[in-house]
């Protein structure tokens, strides 16, 4: 009857192949988008879309006469949130 350690060793041998997969998962093509013959990184488009959406959000907050504390931190966080959501949704 195998002991607990030998069962764990057998299980590790079965799943050891997945470790190299995680090590090379970042070795893919860079997500670049060709625009008029030049290649731009996809994070650049996420940042532009995020900036536009953040400015729209700012305009809505201003029109609603909402006074925010720590405005710089809030808008920076909104910019980062929108950029990550665009990246998650489209790339």
UniProtKB/Swiss-Prot annotation:
Coiled coil: none annotated. Belongs to the YtcA family. It comes from the Bacteria. It holds the Pfam family Ytca. This is Uncharacterized protein YtcA. PROSITE patterns: PROKAR_LIPOPROTEIN (PS51257). It is found in: Cell membrane; Membrane. GO terms for cellular component: plasma membrane. Keywords: Cell membrane, Lipoprotein, Membrane, Palmitate, Signal, Transmembrane, Transmembrane helix. Residues 1-26 form the signal peptide. It is a lipid-anchor; Multi-pass membrane protein. A lipid is attached at residue 27 (S-diacylglycerol cysteine). A lipid is attached at residue 27 (N-palmitoyl cysteine). The gene is ytcA. It comes from Shigella sonnei (strain Ss046). The chain crosses the membrane at residues 36-56, 70-90. The keyword Transmembrane applies.
